[in-house]
Amino acid sequence: MKILLATDGSKYAQKALDFIVMHPKLLDVQAELLVIHVQIPLPTGFNLIMGFDRALELHDIEAKKIFAPVKKFLEKNAVKYRCLSAIGPIVKEIVDAAKNEHVHLILMGTHGRDLVGRALMGSVAQRVVANSTVPVLLVK
C-alpha cells in the first residue's frame, strides 16, 4: 500500500503521524509512506523584490523546518518514508501528488472547525476529500 500523509506541522498533522504508528498493519513490508508538505507561493511582489532564487530558498528553509520533527518521529518509530515538498494551491498539490505517485490512500489530520468557518471557507481536508480520486482518511 502506498500512503500519502499531508503535513503542515500542526498538532493535527501530528495526530495523523501518531495514527500511522499505532496502526502498523498499514505499513507492512511492502508499504510506502510519502509525506507531503505544501506551501502557498509567496506573493509576486516578494519574488520580484527578493528574487526568485531567494524565494525558493525561503520555501526550502520552511519545508526543512516542517519536515525535521516528522523525520525524527518516523525514524524513532522505524517507519520508512519519503518526503515531498510542493509550492502551489494546497488542495491541488495534494491531490496531484496522490495521482502522480499512484497512492492508495491519503492520510491527513483535521480539526473541528466551527460551522460558520466551514460554510465560509471550507477546509483543506474537506476539499481534498471532494477532489481526490483515492480514499482519504481524516484523523481528528
Predicted regions and their residues:
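Absolute protein N-terminus
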Residues: 1-2, 140
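Small/aliphatic-rich secondary-structure junction motif
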Residues: 2-50, 77
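Active-site-adjacent beta-strand anchor residues
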Residues: 6, 84, 109
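Phosphate- and divalent-cation-binding pockets in alpha/beta enzyme and binding domains
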Residues: 15, 93, 115
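General small-molecule cofactor/ligand-binding pocket signal
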Residues: 34-36, 82-86, 137
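A short acidic, glycine-rich active-site loop
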Residues: 53-65
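Structural beta-alpha unit
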Residues: 72-106
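Gly/Ser-rich helix-loop-strand patches that form or flank binding pockets
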Residues: 96-140
